[in-house]
């Protein structure tokens, strides 16, 4: 996805210079009545707005099934609402172009695909997701939450039901911090070894704990150790849940040095990557630098819920300042 903030700061929009007469009235919005404003009838102005769509708009990306990554969610795009943009600009009278964007849904969405697990998000934008599986302890969670808060990042915490009951205050703190929450089962069993009845109970019991203790209506399940089979997909689908795996494993459970975690993430940094981590000392120490590294490479961060709901992580600019030299 384009970096909208960068373009807002440096784009001169040479296209406007080729039709200065069509835009000259924008430079004196306060002197022109709404009724006589050329936006209401200027074909040239409409052509220029179409160029704004070309520059800042985003086409949706369809969901698809992949032989390696299983179900890959789609991604909604952004379409400029020209009539609403005209109306908002006329009303504002502040020498700014007020852009109104509509969500453009993919033709093929995730819900249209046959049920399957998800290992990555859409490749349609440069975004990645931090997913943190929590089944034991809370020693390193405060530092991780502090980093996420400071960096204004929302991750997805997959919480074990037994852990929630024994660390309720910390679990509630995660929710209060605005973090995304999913299910990690209860007791960290191997889902593939469970009978179907016990597997169904894993989903239901954990969902009940998350709902009654944290107020979470859970739609995500990350199987412990990534062990699952088709029964989990079917049972989760029956409960309107998505089975979530990962693209990149930090192997932080092996307690590596922070630079090892950073190297593994760097080597797997691709659009839509789901990055698996746990609340360990290594992760807590690596997290600030990891977030900076991801952003320095032009990526944004989003939650797993955003991924399965096919929400883009960045919206095009809502205003563009109008100056004789072009748009800023």
Question: What positions do the PLM features span?
Answer:
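N-terminal pre-catalytic segment of deacetylase/amide-hydrolase enzymes
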Residues: 2-130, 139, 301-328
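Histidine (H) residue identity feature
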Residues: 5, 37, 65, 70, ...
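Catalytic domains of cell-wall/extracellular-matrix polysaccharide-remodeling enzymes
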Residues: 189-327
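Residue-identity detector for glycine
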Residues: 30, 57, 74-77, 121-124, ...
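Short acidic/polar alpha-helix capping motifs at helix-coil junctions
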Residues: 80-83, 105-112, 132-138, 174, ...
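Conserved short hydrophobic patches within well-ordered secondary structure
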Residues: 6, 131, 158-159, 274-277
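Active-site beta->alpha N-cap acidic-glycine motif
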Residues: 92-190, 209, 216
